[in-house]
Amino acid sequence: ECTRYMTGVSHTDPEVGTPFALKVMQRLNDACQEWKEKENIDFSLYGTPLESTTYKFAKCLQKRFGIIKGVTDRNYITNSYHVHVTEEINAFDKLKFESQFQKLSPGGAISYVEVPNMQNNIEAVLSVMKYIYDNIMYAELNTKSDYCQVCGYDGEIKIVEEEGSGKLVWECPNCGNRDQDKMSVARRTCGYIGTQFWNQGRTQEIKERVLHL
């Protein structure tokens, strides 16, 4: 969002966006080094995937700056330097792109690849894992593992917009069950797989994720 606001393009744009984003990351690292020398306390840059911050910061930015297309027009902001969840990119290109930002995140970093159910395509999983091992510091595969306790549906439970309120809710595509107490939904956020459901900002982000395989 920062890069898009400052340059008008995504940080995946090789001519303008990426060089600008890398300069921002380097400046943040330089600031950490300056603070370290001044305070004799270690500072480091961390590529955070904070759960509530993505929603909280989005609402604060909307309140302060209004709605800016491609910047503050969603109820979430992108985690650290990740490729935006709606941007079409394959798994290998995404990992290669984000690896250059991980090198500038000495305090910690993580990248994700969104995949469908891969239980019948282990060869593809191993291919991505090998690429991760050879090319990036830390990355994980996100898949869907849901279960409806009403009808026994075993597949991806969808996010839909509730009639009238516009609220995002989880719905079994087989029987229409929307009772969160009667379904098991697992999604990776903040580096771990959670099953406790999420705020509206994070739910919108999950809904808009595109697959990378």
Show where each model-derived region lies:
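Long, C-terminal-biased catalytic regions of enzyme "large/alpha" subunits
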Residues: E1-L213
